Structures are given as structure tokens and as C-alpha cells.
Swiss-Prot record:
Organism expressing this protein natively: Atropa belladonna (Belladonna)
Membrane topology recorded in Swiss-Prot or TrEMBL: Peripheral membrane protein
Free-text function comment from the UniProt entry: NDH shuttles electrons from NAD(P)H:plastoquinone, via FMN and iron-sulfur (Fe-S) centers, to quinones in the photosynthetic chain and possibly in a chloroplast respiratory chain. The immediate electron acceptor for the enzyme in this species is believed to be plastoquinone. Couples the redox reaction to proton translocation, and thus conserves the redox energy in a proton gradient.
Keyword ATP-binding belongs to the record: no
Pfam families in the cross-refs: Oxidored_q6 (PF01058)
An example Gene Ontology CC term for this record: respiratory chain complex I
Name of the featured protein: NAD(P)H-quinone oxidoreductase subunit K, chloroplastic
Amino acid sequence: MNSIQFPLLDRTAQNSVISTTLNDLSNWSRLSSLWPLLYGTSCCFIEFASLIGSRFDFDRYGLVPRSSPRQADLILTAGTVTMKMAPSLVRLYEQMPEPKYVIAMGACTITGGMFSTDSYSTVRGVDKLIPVDVYLPGCPPKPEAVIDAITKLRKKISRELYEDRIRSQRVNRCFTTNHKFHVRRSIHTGNYDQRVLYQPPSTSEIPTEIFFKYKNSVSSPELVN
């Protein structure tokens, strides 16, 4: 063994030693290389598509869009989720490897939006199907808001503990076979209620048939008086 000393090498190696934990190293590597699966169904996805341009340049965050859920660790749902699309969304989430994250973008994804009141086929919130990490409200959210949501997700990943993530996986498991959607008959048929539509305010207590029958039997001068 050659006993030649390398003082410069020893000094350089001593000054460049980094001590960390395996958990912090894993978090640092994941937060800088998020690979999103873009699940866009409505106008909110158009706002996210503007991030690809040079004005916002989302490549600087390490985002690499993937077309396969098996290669993604982040799914971004943007737009309305219907009952027929719900099993497909859950299956995509199940096919993603652990650890995986979800960003719910837009009012339609979070609460159902304007379709949540009288729509029979809209899911009232994607968190009823899969666990959501970051909620991004808006109709639609601006690209700056999307960047802020990604930044908050990166901060969450940096503070994450491996034990907590394993514990949450046992609680927030979503299986496709457990989601049984029953489509019930809606009371909103789309037909106008003729009694409400043609009923004057002054004759609200008079049935429609009696009112029009009396109106046709009375002459014009009597109506004027």
C-alpha cells in the first residue's frame, strides 16, 4: 500500500461531507422530480396547459408529464368528474406507485361546482373517491395558483415522515370494487311545470284550469273594468 499523503484531497473531502437521514434524502429527491399524470376533463386543464409555455416554464420544478399512471407519482385532476368516470379515476390512482399525491384543481373537482346542485351524474368532490393532498380552488385557477399549489406540495413532501406515510396508506386505501354507484331516478325531468309557469301572482290560489276557463268566458270590456 502506498503511504503517500494527499493533504489537499483530505481537506476537500472533509469539507464536503454531508450528514443527513435516509428520510430527508428520500424527500429531497422526490420533491425535485414530481412526475404528474394530467387528468383534465374541463376548462381548468387549459389553464394548466399554459404552464408548459416559456412564460411559466414548469420544467424548472422538475415536472415531467407522464401518460402512464405506472410512471407517475402525482395525479392532477382538473375538471368535472362524472359517475361513469369515477371508477376509471380510482383505477388510475391505484396503478400509481407509492408514494403518490393528488392535487384537486378547480371548483368542479373539489365540490362539483355549478353541477353540484341538480346534476344526477356529477361526483360532489373528488375526495370522495381518492385522498387529496392539495386543494386548489378557482373557476378556473390561474397558472400562478397552480405553481403555488405545486410549491405547497413540495413543502409537504419535504416535511413528510416515512412512518406517517405508511400509516396513511393503510387508512386511505381506495379499491375499485368498493365503489358501487347507484344511479337513482331524478325528480328533475327537464319539463317546465305549466301551473307555475303561467300562473299570475294575483291568482296564485286559483287552479290553472279554472283561471283560463273563466278568462275565456269573460269578454274584453269586463276584463278592462
